[in-house]
């Protein structure tokens, strides 16, 4: 995609990946094509940055809670609404002897782990950067509270949690090892399909994302997935590609046929039971993942620098100091600071 000419005419992007594509000047504005060929596309699908349409979104996503209804009922545990309640519920499940590691989330070192920090920090009301600048702003009480909650949850998870991505925790769930889990909404389809233990499938329920630290917005971020078009391709290619993808991204038949595969942003979508996590997140006022040019550098620093804290090798304050130092070095290199 970053060759000239580009090998591909389109690329699927999301909140986190569109900004680097723009920074490298790899994608083109779509305003003219939207005017010409976008009649089926809703305004809410148009991702506008600095006044220009840079992507057309077709689905929404977030991470939210999944729970085993049978396990919670057996132990008289209410459906958790906060991460503090998730911890208490997990401790009760462990004490009952039903499960040794009742909680799971994608804590794989790197991108996944950083995403868990991002969610929890936003839930605590954190702002990643000092107002109006690219100066980091995580080495504070909210950052420490975020790390402490991640540590509590990790202690209730499989000891190999630092290797567990979304696929690995899905396997843990389907094996009956886990009763509470934070996972992407887009994964619900495979958890609720006919494969695997029918008793576990039947007892698998979805609810909104949890809040944390007395906050009133979810400790979660809203995401969109959409298509962008390569700048380094002929205009005729861009036009043909846009027409094909705009047809797909406004296709009511597709949305009806695949209604339970995703939370579609396409007109005519009727949310089903698998959409509950995203719908609840929106109702609760979840914030979108930050579309800031320097956010990728912060995300990268978090994914590598908080591991030692979770392993008990350094303090929360030291870990946050390390994150800021790693971020500052990269941000200076790339001219953000």
Please provide the spans of the model-predicted regions.
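Short, solvent-exposed loop/beta-turn-alpha elements that line the ligand-binding surface or hinge
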Residues: 28-42, 102-108, 124-145, 193-204, ...
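Early extracytoplasmic/lumenal segment of secretory-pathway proteins
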Residues: 1-18, 318
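C-terminal lobe and pocket-closing loops
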Residues: 186-201, 212-304, 334-336
